[in-house]
């Protein structure tokens, strides 16, 4: 079972080469799962950007949750966008208000346009620096195109 399990398209794709559904996204960090409503940022907690959940990380590494392409990689290093090969748009947001750190404590390993495989190291973060800046380090994973799917379910395993 994966982090986001049972992503189901609201309509069956017409193209014969389309990936099979359900689609599973792996956890992008090691740690404890945080339910969407418990994420300490109202935009994410209310699902405004899409269905999401968090991980309270136990190590400073972020991994690709699926095969895909990096679509966003801001200089601040605190977030990444991925379009998976299955058509799932994923936003990985590291910490709350960490954009204020202006890249300090973040070491991206990918750039926009890079192809990634599930499990590839995407970025490293310094959890001590995030804590010293008084920001929650929760890693938030959002399916930004939630409305394209019949259901998005979080299954912790």
Label the model's feature ranges.
Residues 2-157:
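Contiguous, well-folded functional domains in the mature portion of proteins
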């Amino acid at each position: 079972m994966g982090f986001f399990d049972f992503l189901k398209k609201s309509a069956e794709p017409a193209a014969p080469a389309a990936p099979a559904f359900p689609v599973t996204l792996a956890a992008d960090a090691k740690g404890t799962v945080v339910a969407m409503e418990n994420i300490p940022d109202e935009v994410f907690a209310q699902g405004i950007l899409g269905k999401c959940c968090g991980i309270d990380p136990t190590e400073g590494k972020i991994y690709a949750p699926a095969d895909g392409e990096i679509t966003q990689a801001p200089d601040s290093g605190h977030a990444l966008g991925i379009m998976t090969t299955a058509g799932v748009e994923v936003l990985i947001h590291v910490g709350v208000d960490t954009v204020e750190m202006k890249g300090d404590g973040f070491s991206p390993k990918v750039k926009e346009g890079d192809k990634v495989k599930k499990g590839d190291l995407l970025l490293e973060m310094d959890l001590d620096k995030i804590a010293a800046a008084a920001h929650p380090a929760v890693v938030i994973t959002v399916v930004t195109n939630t409305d394209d799917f019949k259901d998005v379910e979080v299954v912790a395993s």
